[in-house]
């Protein structure tokens, strides 16, 4: 059995890879491992709008109840809401059934511990080991020891909306905002929060039917929103993904504003308020060099981690930083939540736009994005580290780096899933870096022939 858990829980095609049987086992093992020693543990269960959610929820909950835990089912709700509410309700764990930005046929199961954090690799391995060993030493409960399912009646959504609203001071009156909910989990929460704060709210893709989640919509397909913002003279647009743990933005001219720009704008604002701990933002190695240059001018440090919001969060927790995130729009505000939170990000950004008295595009001029080129070089899995060993490749990387002279960079990343390495170059001249990236990729491929 290979490793069941990926970077964001267990994910696969629902009913084929992520079956009801597997969901039952994950519920049983997760509840047992996460609540050991607790008399009558409580586990919060939420999901996005996928058609397979009902099937997987039924199986997952059956597993939870079989080991004597209570399952509190809150229905369709954003992933970050489960992270927050697990803490607020003093639950012993939280589970979300969602495949985030993936197409409808996929689904996933993701656990949070009692503090609202994603699980460590060690805990995930313990859950997998229990399933692999066929629940050896797990007692079979009967009678009054079996757990109960509790259907929650909307209080959870209300509590999450109130929490998200509380993260900004004042209101959003006078702001005209377009929201794209991706026909996903934020179709109620995001719309209500913005309306209650006084914004003029226009919404697209907020009619989920079980199969239209992420379809040509949301943060992975923002084209319709870009058009809508311009056509309707909105001050800004905000696009969520299926489980609303990420958010991208659109300026009033219809330009897509990615996570790097959001981090730059929010980082500068936090510093102004004296809330940017250690004057540092945490980003990944894939963030644009333009962000580093912009932050240097603002006397803000950038610390880089491996790709993945879990690594960003690890770094933030280790050194008590206030903000971090990825280009994809996973932004973590550690003062507010324990994971990327699309609605909290959207509200911070909207509030900054309103209070600044500037247009969104003016705020975005804080940063100039450098041209970026990504080229794949095909290599076998056992030769993915050749760029670290081969002298000619190392020398070529050094030469390119020297020639870019601080206004560009080379980054090589082995793929975690395919037999290739990704060659990424950034610099001021698109044509030049294009040529250099393709040349370097070719050199790597020639060396492994």
Swiss-Prot record:
Keyword Secreted among UniProt keywords = no
Reaction catalyzed: alpha-D-glucosamine 1-phosphate = D-glucosamine 6-phosphate
Detail which positions bind Mg(2+): 100, 241, 243, 245
What the entry lists under Gene3D superfamilies is as follows: Alpha-D-Glucose-1,6-Bisphosphate, subunit A, domain 3, Alpha-D-phosphohexomutase, C-terminal domain
Coiled coil ranges: none
Tell me its EC number(s), please: 5.4.2.10
Q: InterPro entries of this UniProt entry?
A: A-D-PHexomutase_a/b/a-I, A-D-PHexomutase_a/b/a-I/II/III, A-D-PHexomutase_a/b/a-II, A-D-PHexomutase_a/b/a-III, A-D-PHexomutase_C, A-D-PHexomutase_C_sf, A-D-PHexomutase_CS, Alpha-D-phosphohexomutase_SF
Q: Name one GO molecular function term.
A: magnesium ion binding
Q: Name one GO cellular component term.
A: cytosol
User: Pfam families recorded for this chain?
Assistant: PGM_PMM_I, PGM_PMM_II, PGM_PMM_III, PGM_PMM_IV
Modified positions (Phosphoserine) are: 100
What is the role of this chain? Catalyzes the conversion of glucosamine-6-phosphate to glucosamine-1-phosphate.
Which family does the UniProt entry place this protein in? Belongs to the phosphohexose mutase family.
- Recorded protein name is Phosphoglucosamine mutase
Q: What is the lineage of its organism?
A: Bacteria, Bacillati, Bacillota, Clostridia, Eubacteriales
């Amino acid at each position: 059995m290979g490793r069941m858990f990926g970077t964001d829980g267990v994910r696969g095609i629902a009913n084929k890879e992520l079956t009801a049987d597997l969901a039952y086992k994950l519920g049983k093992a997760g509840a047992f491992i996460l609540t050991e020693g607790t008399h009558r543990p409580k586990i919060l269960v939420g999901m996005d709008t996928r058609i397979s959610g009902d099937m997987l929820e039924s199986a997952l909950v059956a597993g939870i109840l079989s080991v004597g835990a209570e399952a509190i089912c809150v229905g369709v709700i954003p992933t970050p809401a489960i992270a927050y509410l697990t803490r607020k309700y003093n639950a012993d764990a939280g589970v979300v059934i969602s495949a985030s930005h993936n197409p409808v046929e996929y689904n996933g199961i993701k656990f949070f511990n009692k503090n609202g954090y994603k699980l460590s690799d060690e805990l995930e391995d313990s859950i997998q080991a229990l399933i692999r060993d066929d629940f050896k030493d797990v007692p079979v409960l009967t009678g009054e020891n079996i757990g109960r399912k509790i259907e929650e009646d909307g209080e959870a959504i209300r509590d999450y909306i109130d929490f998200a609203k509380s993260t900004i001071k004042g209101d959003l009156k006078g702001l005209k905002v377009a929201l794209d909910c991706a026909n996903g989990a934020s179709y109620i929460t995001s719309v209500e929060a913005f309306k209650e704060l006084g914004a003029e709210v226009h919404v697209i893709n907020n009619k989920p039917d079980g199969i239209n989640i992420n379809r040509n919509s949301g943060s992975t397909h923002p084209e319709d929103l870009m058009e809508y913002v311009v056509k309707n003279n909105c001050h800004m647009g905000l696009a969520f993904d299926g489980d609303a743990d990420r958010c991208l933005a659109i300026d009033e001219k219809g330009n897509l504003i990615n996570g790097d720009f959001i981090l730059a704008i929010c980082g500068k604002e936090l510093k102004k308020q004296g809330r940017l701990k250690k004057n540092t933002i945490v980003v990944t190695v894939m963030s644009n060099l333009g962000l580093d240059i912009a932050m240097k001018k603002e006397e803000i440090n950038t610390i880089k981690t491996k790709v993945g919001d879990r690594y960003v969060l690890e770094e933030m927790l280790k050194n008590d930083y206030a903000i971090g995130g990825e280009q994809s729009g996973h932004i973590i505000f550690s003062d507010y939540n324990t994971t990327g939170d699309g609605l909290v990000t959207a509200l911070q950004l909207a509030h900054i736009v309103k209070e600044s008295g500037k247009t969104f595009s003016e705020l975005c001029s804080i940063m100039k994005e450098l041209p970026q080129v990504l080229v794949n070089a095909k290599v076998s899995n056992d030769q993915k580290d050749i760029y670290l060993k081969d002298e000619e490749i190392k020398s070529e990387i050094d030469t390119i780096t020297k020639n870019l002279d601080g206004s560009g960079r080379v980054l090589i990343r082995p793929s975690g899933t395919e037999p290739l390495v990704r060659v990424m170059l950034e610099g001021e001249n698109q044509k030049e870096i294009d040529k250099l990236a393709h040349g370097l990729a070719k050199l790597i491929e020639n060396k492994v022939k």
